[in-house]
């Protein structure tokens, strides 16, 4: 019961063919092959040294830098008075 015999795999294969059809299974296997090929290509590209990245030259300012006016240290005076009211 613990091992999968050849008959188990044949039954599984027949069920898969009935559920998905022959066309879907062949498409799936083709997609798996493309994925493996892309993975191998990516691994091969990783081993090759890459060209060094050239940094862009620094940009020089043509206009002087504008600064903001100094922040006031005192708060602005209140424009309206607050009144305590009791709700009746």
Swiss-Prot record:
It is a single-pass membrane protein. NCBIfam families: PRK00720.1, tatAE. HAMAP family: TatA_E. InterPro entries: TatA/B/E, TatA/E. Part of the twin-arginine translocation (Tat) system that transports large folded proteins containing a characteristic twin-arginine motif in their signal peptide across membranes. TatA could form the protein-conducting channel of the Tat system. It comes from Methylobacterium sp. (strain 4-46). This is Sec-independent protein translocase protein TatA. GO terms for molecular function: protein transmembrane transporter activity. It is found in: Cell inner membrane. Keywords: Cell inner membrane, Cell membrane, Membrane, Protein transport, Translocation, Transmembrane, Transmembrane helix, Transport. The chain crosses the membrane at residues 1-21. Belongs to the TatA/E family. GO terms for cellular component: TAT protein transport complex. The keyword Iron-sulfur does not apply.
């Amino acid at each position: 019961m613990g091992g999968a015999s050849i008959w188990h795999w044949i039954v599984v294969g027949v069920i898969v063919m009935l559920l998905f059809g022959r066309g879907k299974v062949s498409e799936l296997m083709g997609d798996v092959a493309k994925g493996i090929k892309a993975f191998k290509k990516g691994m091969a590209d990783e081993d090759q040294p890459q060209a060094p990245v050239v940094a862009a030259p620094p940009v020089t300012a043509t206009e002087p830098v504008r600064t903001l006016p100094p922040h006031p240290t005192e708060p602005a005076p209140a424009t309206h008075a607050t009144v305590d009211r009791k709700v009746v």
